[in-house]
Amino acid sequence: MKDAWWKEAVVYQVYPRSFMDANGDGIGDLQGVTSRLDYLQELGIDVIWLSPVYQSPNVDNGYDISDYQAIQPEFGTMADFDELLKQAHRRGIRIVMDLVVNHSSDQHPWFVESRKSKDNPYRDYYIWREPKADGSAPNNWGSCFGGSAWQLDPETNMYYLHLFAPQQPDLNWKNPKLRDDVYRMMTWWCDKGVDGFRMDVISMISKPDEMPDDPNAPVGGYGNFGAYCIHGPHVHEYLKEMNARVLSRYDLMTVGETAGVTIEEAQKYAGEDSHELSMVFQFEHVDVAGKYGAWRTEQIPMLFLKKVLSKWQTELHGKAWNSLFLGNHDQPRTVSAFGDDRPQWRVRSAKMLATCLHMMEGTPYIYQGEELGMTNCPFQSLDEFRDIDSLNGYRRWVTDGPLTHDEFFPYLLFKSRDNARTPMQWNDSPNAGFTCGTPWIRVNPNYTEVNAAAAMADPDSTFYYFQKLIRLRKAHPVIVHGRYELLEKDDPALFIYTRTLDDAQLLVMCNFKEQTREWTMPSGFAGAQVLISNTGRTQQAEQTITLQPYEALVLLK
């Protein structure tokens, strides 16, 4: 496979609203991010993926953009962004922007114009359809956030498509003028010096000409647009054009958010010779159906996690590049979702999960606070939630649905995206050192124990463990490029694999359970070098090993 800087990089996702507030208004901002660059440099990350900081009415926390070339005032100014970029580059840290071009805000000038009349020059920047004969929506598709995917606009008595909120109308990528404007905007950011893009729901940008009803829609309910709009008819054509017009002219890292992507489809988006993206995010290991739609209260079975991650490791090797993640701004906290967040096991299981992920082939992503072992938040009441998806879920299942508050609330507690969006826990001062004002969302009360200052004062903390994992990746090519082989594929507790490159071989052993387990290692690993251990193990002389609860051990021979 071809070498590229992003194959050896570790990415840190910053959700600016919750990272660091410099001006005391309770909302994280760009100056706040800049003020914490030394912390990120100490951790050792190479890239910051910055969640959206563009001008936005904030219906979906910045994923509804009203001006792609302006900064949201609550985050600061363009001068603040330029300073962040300069200071990051000075520290050898690259900046990747979130790019949201499946849809815009309904307050974007394009849409303000588009809705004025049927013959407006911007009409075809969006997807408009006539009502059915009875005046109802053009088809039965539902939106990702609940309700119909169509909104009637009284100005022209036509419907526009919105796969997300009604305030997020979908852009019409069939229109070459729209594509030209998007490429111009991307070029403007590249010329400014940004180092790449994370492309939001990029697999949805191509819509079919025909938009039939989903025949499998529940009676009286909404259908699924996925079969028609995900990996749509022209998506690869558009991305190849984007690559030729913009991406290939710069040394960028690009990652596409591609829900529902298959191995075969991923190779089209991010194959070595596809000329589209550097890599994609697949969500097969985290998007598991729950009892009520996506809402669940139980962890994803470890055997399922192992099977899915191993499939992607094995089948993309040598063909395309993996993105490695367990958490992001849309997922519960990693240690709560996959590990054991009880105080006695939180640190060890957080280290174990990090080991399991960071020893794989691909580019690892750390979500802010993951390096501290931050946990899900014990929200007390509905009014503490801020996330549109959570509030819509409550309305769907409780207000308009069959469940009581007490029946559904545990599902919100476990799965809400707000778990990832509580403020970064910097120290044990009020509001976890995130703000001197009133935070926009509540702070997790465990900040008095779980915080960056405490972690940096403790040589055995998760912070320094992540730092070591990052350093190991830079020191050992086998971690970056080695071939993956899963051992014990049917064991429900042990996630064990090898990585092999030339004469170097790693053995990665992770115990996902609270029970100790004996295991016999392959020959040649007894007495091998201990690369990293979350239990303080310095050697393993015997071929049979007793793995402690949530133990992770990596040997190199």
Indicate residue ranges for each PLM-predicted region:
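Active-site and adjacent substrate-binding regions of carbohydrate-active enzymes
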Residues: 1-557
